[in-house]
């Protein structure tokens, strides 16, 4: 085991910060890895039990080894960050939380990697703070709006919402089975870790259900504003994504003037995990050229 991997554990990189951003007054949890001149922020998705570390633990070490500082934010209402009921745009809430975090820890311009909800939130942040974004990497998210090919809500989103309402191991396995292309890659250890994270914060689960009842459309459709996002963007999608259909990725590259698209074959909604090695090489190449 390398010295880098020995120090890059969730516990060793775990930190908390209090943010005050407008009417937000929250304690956020984040993981702070490496010490490079440039910083990459990673934003996780909206699944029950999600966290920055759970989403991106296969992607941190290559970035740190390449000389980047990596910050993984637990969004408000997930993992070790404070609970919240969101009655408005979840994307904008997370963008404001990210601004508060960056201000609190003294970071100005960052690159952002966002998966699913994290992609939506990254676009929201780029629209509100264009001068603070270097490059964007968006996977399985980035804008709302209906699919032209798949009935909405999608199969995956229905299972996700069902898991929030009834957080059982059986419902977790049903959701995870459509989360990735090859469900044989999912281990009992992974299921248990996700279940433990979910059940350790029942308040987060209950608040997500309350948020949906108040505002069923938690994620803003940024389609009409994508032309304002001028940062270089790498859009990555799984051909077999059953949560956010592939044509959402096409919307992003049609709308954002400096975006390019890569589609992974035999890949679901978790490209950074399902194709970690290829994903890591692609991201490093994009960030450095």
Curated annotation (Swiss-Prot):
Keywords in alphabetical order: Aromatic hydrocarbons catabolism, Hydrolase
UniProt-annotated site: Transition state stabilizer, residues: 116
Described purpose of this protein according to its UniProt entry: Catalyzes the cleavage of the C5-C6 bond of 2-hydroxy-6-oxononadienedioate and 2-hydroxy-6-oxononatrienedioate, a dienol ring fission product of the bacterial meta-cleavage pathway for degradation of phenylpropionic acid.
EC number: 3.7.1.14
Protein name per Swiss-Prot or TrEMBL: 2-hydroxy-6-oxononadienedioate/2-hydroxy-6-oxononatrienedioate hydrolase 1
Gene Ontology molecular function: any one: protein homodimerization activity
Pathway field: Aromatic compound metabolism; 3-phenylpropanoate degradation
Subunit structure comment from the entry: Homodimer.
GO cellular component: cytoplasm
Catalytic activity: (2Z,4E)-2-hydroxy-6-oxonona-2,4-dienedioate + H2O = (2Z)-2-hydroxypenta-2,4-dienoate + succinate + H(+); (2Z,4E,7E)-2-hydroxy-6-oxonona-2,4,7-trienedioate + H2O = (2Z)-2-hydroxypenta-2,4-dienoate + fumarate + H(+)
Segments forming domain AB hydrolase-1: 39-275
Catalytic-site annotation from UniProt: 269
